[in-house]
């Protein structure tokens, strides 16, 4: 069982620890605010009140027993940088740090973060795309040029096999997963899969190709 420590119980840290605990990870949380620590106690193996900016405190706590440490200290840029530096000095294998902007991310990278996340930015981007096109049930950027989207089955595609639609040749996109509601299951489809109006498609393509599909769905 993987041991994960979460430093900082911002909204991001709080919901992350609840989800990881539900997935049966051993979670320890650290925050300087007692009320936040008390809120998370029912969900984690260990919840500690303390200042993670104190390197000696981290050592005494046994932070080196954790393979992964997630730094989620809200918008406290100086705190997250210092904590990340200490974790690097303590030879934590995986340090995932939350950044609030690109400059913050650059510094986190330099002081030792192995992965940097932008939860607010990423949620805003996804929401903007789903607002821009209500046909997109979900939008997930893979990198700067490639995205995943979830869409319902367009009426023109219902009752047709994927091989007949030939989406890759026509539009350059590929359906990688289909969520079926009747019966409920998730399928990695083959060319002979017949689309139903109740299916939900996970589609991958370049942003240009996704934009073209967007116009087809309007």
Task: Label each region the model flagged.
Residues 1-218:
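Cytosolic regulatory regions of ion transport systems
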